[in-house]
């Protein structure tokens, strides 16, 4: 039996968590889910609970398509904003592992500026 690999892109900001599954090339979208599709309140979109439920749904979707092994790319907002992933990133990865999906590599895909725009000045 040939094993089919996929790539799970987890975009975790402090406002939302988006889980997006593509094929290994990244060209074709297989499944996509966001925190807002799971919870009612806007304040809960980035919560670990929303990320966990989304990851379980994604695991079911990709299993139907025949993907059993994945690489994970975690991305924070980055740029001149926060370089740390939001609260949903860790929960989503843990939920995927618990759902029985084999995880290959976990890598950080946060964009880092090479002297881009000036960051916001702090309050006095």
Swiss-Prot record:
Report the GO terms under cellular component. Answer: ribonucleoprotein complex; ribosome
Q: Name one GO biological process term.
A: translation
Q: Does the keyword GTP-binding apply?
A: no
What is this protein's function per UniProt? Located on the platform of the 30S subunit.
- Which proteins does it associate with, and in what oligomeric form? Part of the 30S ribosomal subunit.
Q: Which family does it belong to?
A: Belongs to the universal ribosomal protein uS11 family.
Q: Which PANTHER family match?
A: 40S RIBOSOMAL PROTEIN S14/30S RIBOSOMAL PROTEIN S11
Question: What is the protein name given in its UniProt record?
Answer: Small ribosomal subunit protein uS11
Q: Which gene encodes it?
A: rps11
């Amino acid at each position: 039996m040939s094993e089919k690999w996929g790539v799970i892109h987890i975009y975790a900001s402090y406002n939302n968590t988006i889980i997006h599954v593509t094929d290994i090339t990244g060209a074709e979208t297989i499944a996509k889910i966001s925190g807002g599709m799971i919870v009612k309140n806007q304040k809960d979109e980035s919560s670990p609970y929303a990320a966990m439920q989304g990851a379980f749904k994604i695991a079911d979707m990709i299993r139907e398509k025949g993907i059993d092994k994945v690489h994970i790319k975690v991305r924070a907002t980055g740029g001149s904003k926060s370089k740390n992933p939001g609260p949903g990133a860790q929960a989503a990865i843990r939920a995927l592992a618990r759902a029985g999906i084999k995880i290959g590599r976990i890598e950080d895909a946060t964009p880092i500026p090479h002297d881009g725009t000036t960051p916001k000045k702090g309050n006095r």
